[in-house]
């Protein structure tokens, strides 16, 4: 019954904001089109469609606001005006009762509040749809007296989320079957992505692990501070981390007054982003101004401070390599290389005609590159590329969409601090150095160090595995095993070539050292 009432409310909000016309106009059925005409007869909507959608999501509550925020990152699927409007959604809800927050902390950690903290501020400093944050001072153990931020999960979220997600899945299924653009927009995939995103956010231990990983990655960095995680005070409902002090990155005048070089700060932000993406393959994916502070303490003046680790992105070595090559090809205006990389990486279907994709990419990107480099937005270039990719059935990877959204945030922050920020001038040396390390001799030697022991371990088993496959082939008279054997033989040949190259390299290196010592001995005698 509750679900039925919720559905009725959703339908009412859709009708109130005139979204029925927007939603139903894309359906294939003539009957539905006729229904649209009847329902909208005499109704006039003065607000743009994107604004109406944003207002409807805000009226439906925090879960739908979250959904709109996630949807705003899928610029490969949405019209630009709708995506821009959804990006304005703010995840702000009234705080829940501090007594309930204290009770959750006590139940989750198994101790009274007075045994856990010297002080616990009952007035929350931040409140969102998933959790709210209180400041406190730890009691007991080696961290006694440390100032911390306590993030507490909002109670009763799971039933509400599951109910709304069930409705979203039903609507997505209908859309995919009946809507003309249903298959292209992949509504069920979008809802499934949102489902995973929400359930990840409901586990604060996951967020604590993200914070710990990022802190470890930047432990020796002079650019970024990440709060320490206090694991003994962390559960799936409570996340306790070091309290950080700083000025919001968007308050540029206040930062300058404190002696921070905002031009350097803008460049540092770009370097932090590319370091996360290409060095670590793990990046903070929610870098809006509310989640970034800047330290004004004398010992760490001008260092960024990261907060809120609920959304992170990860890239494989494969993705990092192709992404770096794409960026370099973009700024060399080598559109053929960009198109070729899309096909080679599997992002575009194998049957894609490279020349056609190249022409579409040129038409998409050339208007941007006619501007001065300081005015070029890498994030917007990626966004336009995703939109162009619709025509070629290019499968946009979720991690790349997260990266594009984060890059837009980084650029926006950077140009608030320094309007003349040349993103490419800052990023290019980093990318070229990374590519040299990965693809040059150093990268080859590093990979050989990692892979050679594994290859050496596998080689003795190869004859036995080949014999087993041949026996199975003889029994089953199948062809799949032959293909497997061929693949194994190809792998064996490739392994032999790589090992030979490694031995040749090591041998040459050894000969060089011996020759150097011999020449030195001859020179002395």
Swiss-Prot record:
It is an enzyme of class 2 (transferase). Its EC number is 2.7.-.-. It is a single-pass membrane protein. Keywords: ATP-binding, Cell inner membrane, Cell membrane, Kinase, Membrane, Nucleotide-binding, Transferase, Transmembrane, Transmembrane helix, Ubiquinone biosynthesis. InterPro entries: ABC1_dom, Kinase-like_dom_sf, Prot_kinase_dom, UbiB, UbiB_bact, UbiB_kinase. The active site is at 286 (proton acceptor). Residues 119-501 form the Protein kinase domain. The chain crosses the membrane at residues 502-522. One of its GO terms (biological process) is ubiquinone biosynthetic process. It is found in: Cell inner membrane. Pfam families: ABC1. This is Probable protein kinase UbiB. It comes from Ralstonia nicotianae (strain ATCC BAA-1114 / GMI1000) (Ralstonia solanacearum).
């Amino acid at each position: 019954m509750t679900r039925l009432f919720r559905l009725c409310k959703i339908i009412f909000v859709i009708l109130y904001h005139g979204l029925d016309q927007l939603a139903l106009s894309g359906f294939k059925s003539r009957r539905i089109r006729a229904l649209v005409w009847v329902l909208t007869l005499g109704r006039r909507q003065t607000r743009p469609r994107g604004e109406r959608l944003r207002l409807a999501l805000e009226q439906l509550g925090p879960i739908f606001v979250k959904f709109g925020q996630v949807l705003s990152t899928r610029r490969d699927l949405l019209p630009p005006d709708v995506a821009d409007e959804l990006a304005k959604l703010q995840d702000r809800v009234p705080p829940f009762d501090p007594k309930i927050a204290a009770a959750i902390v006590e139940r989750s950690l198994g101790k009274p509040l007075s045994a856990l903290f010297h002080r616990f501020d009952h007035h929350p400093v931040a409140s969102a749809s998933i959790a709210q944050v209180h400041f406190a001072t730890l009691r007991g153990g080696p961290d006694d007296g440390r100032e911390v931020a306590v993030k507490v999960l909002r109670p009763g979220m799971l039933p509400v989320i599951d109910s709304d997600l069930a409705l979203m899945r039903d609507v997505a299924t209908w859309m995919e079957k009946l809507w003309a653009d249903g298959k292209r927009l992949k509504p069920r995939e979008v809802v499934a992505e949102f489902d995973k995103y929400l359930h990840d956010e409901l586990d604060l231990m996951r967020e604590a692990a993200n914070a710990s990983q990022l802190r470890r990655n930047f432990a020796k960095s002079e650019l970024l501070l990440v709060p320490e995680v206090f694991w003994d005070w962390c559960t799936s409902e409570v996340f306790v981390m070091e309290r950080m002090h700083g000025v919001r990155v968007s308050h540029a005048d206040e930062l300058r007054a404190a002696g921070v070089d905002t031009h350097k700060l803008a460049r540092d932000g770009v370097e932090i982003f590319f370091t996360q993406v290409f060095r670590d393959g793990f990046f903070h994916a929610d870098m809006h101004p509310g989640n970034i502070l800047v330290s004004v303490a004398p010992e760490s003046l001008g260092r960024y401070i990261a907060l809120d680790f609920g959304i992170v992105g990860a890239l494989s070595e494969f993705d990092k390599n192709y992404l770096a090559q794409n960026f370099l090809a973009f700024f060399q205006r080598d559109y053929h290389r960009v198109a070729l990389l899309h096909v080679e990486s599997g992002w575009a279907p194998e049957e894609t005609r490279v020349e056609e994709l190249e022409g579409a990419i040129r038409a998409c990107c050339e208007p941007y590159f006619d501007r001065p480099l300081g005015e070029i937005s890498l994030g917007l270039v990626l966004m336009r590329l995703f939109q162009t990719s619709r025509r070629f059935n290019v499968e946009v990877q979720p991690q790349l969409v997260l990266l594009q959204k984060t890059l837009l945030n980084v650029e926006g922050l950077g140009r608030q601090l320094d309007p003349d920020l040349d993103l490419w001038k800052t990023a290019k040396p980093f990318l070229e150095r990374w590519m040299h390390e990965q693809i040059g001799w150093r990268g080859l030697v590093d990979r050989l160090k990692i892979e050679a022991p594994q290859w050496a371990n596998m080689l003795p088993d190869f004859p036995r595995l080949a014999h087993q496959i041949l026996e199975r082939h003889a029994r089953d008279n199948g062809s799949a095993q032959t293909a497997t054997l061929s693949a194994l033989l190809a792998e064996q040949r490739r392994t032999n070539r790589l090992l030979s190259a490694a031995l040749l390299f090591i041998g040459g290196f050894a000969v060089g050292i011996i020759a150097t010592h011999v020449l030195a001995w001859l020179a002395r005698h």
